[in-house]
Amino acid sequence: QVARRKDAINDWGSIVALSYIAAQRTLYGYNDMADAKALLESIARSFGYIYGREKHVRINTVSQSPTPTTAGNGVLGLKDLMEFAESMSPLGNASANDCADYVLTLFSDLTRKVTMQNLFHDGGFSSMGMSRRAMRTYEKGLRFEDVHEHQFPFGTGDNKEE
């Protein structure tokens, strides 16, 4: 809003803010930052409409892979989260430099009609349910009793007393 009041951005300019998937999905350890990122994404949509109509300024957010930044390092279990995202993402985690390159495209004329979007830059993590690599890791961490006990949660049907 300050940029708008001071008329600091040219027509067809672009504003990009960094977000994270925890704004939309629960991720252990992200806590209050998830709420802040959700608010940021909402502001980008709401204010994107206003600034877009007035000066064709585009406002977007980018949800980046977990990245060891100053803020990111404050997240409980960041290393584990990075390892999990790496195992889930078909293309692997995007680095901070990869993200910077991507954001540059959002400042270019190549994306003149992209606005009010949260764009994922996470190697495909946001679209995954479970990868084979993550499933293998998960299975190795289970005890046989855990698997056997929960394999037939409603009984096997073999025992008449079940």
Which positions does each model-derived feature cover?
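Intrinsically disordered, low-complexity Ser/Thr- and acidic-rich flexible linkers and loops
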Residues: 7-9, 138-144
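C-terminal helical subdomain
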Residues: 61, 79-114, 119-123, 143-162
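A short, polar/charged loop-to-alpha-helix boundary motif
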Residues: 129-139
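Short, small/polar-rich loop/turn modules that mediate ligand/substrate recognition or access, typified
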Residues: 12, 53-58, 114-116
